[in-house]
Amino acid sequence: MEDRLIVTASPHIRDTSTTRGLMGNVVIALLPAVLAAGLIFGVQALVLVAVTTLACVAFEYIYEKLLKKPNTVGDLSAVVTGIILALNMPVGMPLWIAVVGAFVAIVITKQLFGGLGYNFANPALVGRIVLFLGLTSRMTAYVYPDMAVDALASATPLAVADKTTLPLLDVFLGFRGGMMGEVCVLAILLGFAYLVATRTIQATIPVTIVATVFVLTALNTGSAYTALIECMSGGLLFGAVFMATDYVTSPFTTKGKLFYGVFIGLITFLIRHFGSMNEGMSYAILLGNLMTPWFNAWGHQTPLGYKKPKKAKKGGAE
């Protein structure tokens, strides 16, 4: 009797990949962005990545040790969170602030909700948003590659009124101000290609998000070039590839992924063009995370052969 088949409605998810294997692939995919940050902004960028990652791992280990929970440091999820969180900061960020962000991401967002698989939103995303809301001036102190790390806040491509004046190659290669992980489009695309090639993620969500922003921006501005610059600027690409695709907080059905991608792209566009902020990707992903159960429900496939029960006629025999 122990070998009975369990019959349930679709979708049926079959995957032999381990959490450690999947997270390991994400770490590898993030390496081009880490190396690009080091080349563009210098050694301090690598130090910030290392400290933030170590802090995330340490907080996870200490929390599980104190509460006598199974140790999950080996699944590399804390490492992924640390790298993504660090790449969502400007290079001049004080290390103690990075540690605070790591605490918010690991302890508050992840562990207090039950650990990996139970968090309501991407931990690194929440860490970024909390730091941005509490330390806006620090989080927007962008540094150009040829400036000192203690320079004052500088404009990013999103803040430039006439984006047609921006050199496409400079934006693509990362010769501009911004968060460490978002400036080099080439590095992000290399990571994206690796994730898709290894089937760690599907291309549906990132492509849908970017396509939505591109189309809406082109229609609103009347310029495909401006739309292209906007898609390559800010946290759109980095967020679409590495944050919106989080396994726990993104839909698992194909239709659900499409709804989710369009929703995030739409909210990002609305915040950028009609809100008070230049960037809206983080808030769009957070709202998308919260909407994921509904996207899964809307995208749920009806089981083969399913027939909707007929309503009993009034006054009929019971």
Task: Put a short name on every predicted segment.
Residues 196-223:
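Conserved mixed alpha/beta catalytic, RNA-binding, or beta-rich assembly cores of soluble enzyme
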Residues 117-189:
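Long hydrophobic alpha-helical segments that form multi-pass transmembrane helix bundles
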Residues 42-55, 92-101, 171, 175-185, ...:
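Structural signature of hydrophobic alpha-helical transmembrane segments
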Residues 77-78, 83-149:
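Membrane-interface helix-loop-helix junctions at boundaries between adjacent transmembrane segments
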